[in-house]
Amino acid sequence: FGYDEFSAHAIKVTRDAEIDIDNDVATTLIQKIEKGLKNRKKAKPTRLVFDKEMPSPLLNYLVKRLGLSTKDLLVPGGRIHNFKDFMDFPENLWKQRSIRKKVNIHPELRQASNITGIVRKKDIMLHFPYHSFDSLIDLLREAAMDASVESIKITCYRLAPKSKVINTLINAVRNGKQVTVILELRARFDEEANLHWKQQLEDAGIKVLLGIPGMKTHAKICVIKRKIQNKSQYLGFVSTGNLNEKTAMVYGDHCLLTSHPGIMADINSIFDYLEPSGFEQKKIKPLRYLLASPFHTRKKMLAFINHEIKQARKKLPSGITLKMNSLSDQSLIERLEAAAQSGVPVKLVIRGICCMHTENNKYKFPVKAISIVDEYLEHARVIIFHHHGHERTFISSADWMVRNLDHRIETTCEIFDKKIKKELK
């Protein structure tokens, strides 16, 4: 008997994902992003990953049809190219994942009847994914239902597909709270999702602001205003990571829950600046406890490094420890190199790109640099300066890159609680 033979081979095409936000004043940012999303689907291919068992005639046909011109764009692979799909597989398929330690509730919150009351008394640091992200959701839920809460202001960059954060904010506005969301539409690969969230939030009656033209809002901050006996009280949080309950299960991040009056005042100042009337004046109110990019972060970090250099040159104890995703800013790297040459012990924990030379004959001590590659993605930014033995410890949404220091709204927050400082170290 005659028969037909069929074969199937998987391919993955990577296209140029850049969305060009031009200066055409006749179109809005939303229109530009919508146009860019349409163009992305037919953008120029930059790579073809293919099944290495694919017959040459079929591969040549694909190369011709896609307009690929160099062998550098061709990557032979196996049968599966999209490993990200494994993230959505059931937990019990792999023994290693089924025996993963259960997520814990923070000890200070475990027996608490409400989180707000605890945060009013003391700072709490949540360490994701070891602590449950539900604690952050519960804080927002309490605010949504608390009759004394007047308003909630929050920034959103990347959100989960079925975001509990969004649901909580919608419930808050339904309960009569004034809710303001700074939503970043230009978060790469989340543009379409954030356009959807913008519509959802506005339909619910929430005030949605899109940040500053030409500058992404990457800060992760929130302030909740309560009115108790005609007196305003504030609490909220500063985080290194996104308000995304899905990625919080696999990304290592830190989130400070606090009612510190100075930190809350500074967060309010940042939100005032992000209002259209604020950034049109191109000025931000002086901040005392937070560092904000693009205004203060670079200058303050350089000052702290220079202080450690002076200490080392006086033969006094010194030290700098950095943990972040990327270290590529030239001016900060030059000062770190000067610190190493002066005898300052420099320790680096950099997940991604690190442009600093860690070996140099001029360094009095070798720079210790590592990258932690394990089950969780190390996303947190932590900065520690020795500072006469009274360590100055910061958490930040910003890596030490030009884009984060000069072209984005970012926040760096000093930690004052001794126990939390010890946890971070």
Feature-to-residue mapping (PLM):
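Hydrophobic alpha/beta core scaffold segments
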Residues: 345-349
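N-terminal localization/anchoring segments of enzymes in phospholipid and broader phosphate metabolism
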Residues: 1-320, 338-342, 354-376, 382-425
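Glycine/threonine-rich ATP-lid/beta-loop region of ATP-binding domains
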Residues: 330-333, 337
